[in-house]
C-alpha cells in the first residue's frame, strides 16, 4: 500500500476538546509585525494540566507541544484518524515488517541543523531506546536504517498495520540532533524542532513561551507567538475566558458553562471515557467477584445526569458514541463473575482534580459503593502528584478520564496500552494471556471492520473480567474568548493553535 502527498490536510472541522491559552502576566497581547506586513499579537492559552514530566517529549507532555504547533511528526492524523503527510511526504509498506518513508525537502530545524534521514533515525532510535519510550510504541519494537538522504526504512518485529499511526503520536516528534545526548536521558526541546512556533522558555509547571519561527517550511505563522499557562483549577480557567486573560481555555467544567457567553462555549463530542480502573493484581479487587460487586454498585445514569448536566452519556462499554461502529459490534460485556458480598471491605478510591468532574464523581461513587457495603477512603490530588503511584498499582480503584484515540487514533492500541501485560498505561494492573492474544491477533489487521471486531472483542474480554467500570462518555467544552479565529477543536486532543490561527477582523 502506498500513501502519497495530498494538497490540503483533512482537519476540516475535527471537533475536539483540547487546549487553551495563557493567563494574565504572560503576555500583554501587544501586536507585533508579521512577515506579510500584517499585525498579529501573541495568543494566550490556559491549559488544564501542568507538565507531568518536565515537558519530556516521550511523556503526555508531548501533546502540549503538538497543540501549540511547537513540534512535528513524520505523519499526522486527519479527521478520520487516517495518517496524512507532514514531515514525510510518502510512505509504502514493502513487506509485512518493512515500511519506507520519504522525507520532505526544504525543512530545517529551528537551530539551523538540516532535517534529513540521519536526524529522523536519531530521533526514532533515541525514543525506542529510552527507559520511558513513547506509549504508542508499546507492543512493537522498531529498527531503522538510512536508505537515502531523504529516505528512512523502518522495520517492526511483528506485523503492524498501524505503524504510520504510531509515528503520528506527538511522542514521536522529530527534534534536531542537538536535542539529544544528555546523560540523564532528557531531551532539549527549546528551539530544536521544525514547527511553526519555536519554544523559547519552560518555566517549571507554570508557563511556556513560544515565538514564531520565521523560517518554517510551510506557511509562516500569523501570530507572533504564544504564551501558555497551566491552570489546573477549572473555575480559574473559566474565569480567564470571561475576563479576557486567556484567548482559549481547555476543558471548561460543566458547572462553569452557564457563566460564559454562549458564543464562548464550543462543545466537542469526544472519544473520551471516564471509568473506574480496578486494581486486579493486589488488594480486595484481585478477587473478580469483588470487582463485579463494585461494578454492579455504580449507577452511571445518575452520575451523568447530576454531574455532567447533559454533557455526557452513561457508559455501557469502554468505547462510546464518538465511534459510531462500536455499539453495533459490541459483544457480551457483562461480568463473568457473580458479585460477592462486600460488607466491611475497605478500599481506597483515588482520582485527580485536574478534571473538575472527577472529584464529584468520587463523591457519588463512594456513596454508591458504600451502599452495598464497601468502606471507602478517597485520595484526591493533582494528576502530576499521583501518576507514578497509579501506574504502579498504588490504589484499589482510580477514576480515570481516557481518550481512546489519543495516541494512534486506533482504539485497539489504546486498549492494549491500558489492559495488556506490557501496557504502558495499565492502571488496572491487568495481565491476562488470553486478552493479550486478542490484542496480538488484532494488530495484524489493517484499519477497517476486522480490526474493529478485534477491538470490540478486547473490550468484551476486559469488561467480562470487570477490570474497569465504564462510567460516562464525555463531551468537552473548549472556551474561546472571541479574540482569535482558527482554533482547532480536535477530538484526538493533539491540535489547537496552528500557523493559520489569526486575530478576529
Which residues fall in each region the model found?
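N-terminal lobe/hinge region of extracytoplasmic solute-binding protein
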Residues: 46-94, 125, 192
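Gly/Pro-rich hinge or "lid" segments in bacterial periplasmic/extracellular proteins
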Residues: 168-219, 225
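Surface-exposed binding/hinge segments that line
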Residues: 92, 98-102, 136-179, 201
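Extracytoplasmic/peripheral linker and loop segments enriched in polar/acidic and small residues
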Residues: 384-386, 416-481, 505
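Long beta-strand-rich cores associated with HINT superfamily self-processing modules
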Residues: 478-505
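Structural transition elements
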Residues: 309-343, 353-360
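Periplasmic-binding protein-like
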Residues: 281-322, 360-361, 462-467
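Ligand-site clamp/hinge motif
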Residues: 212-258
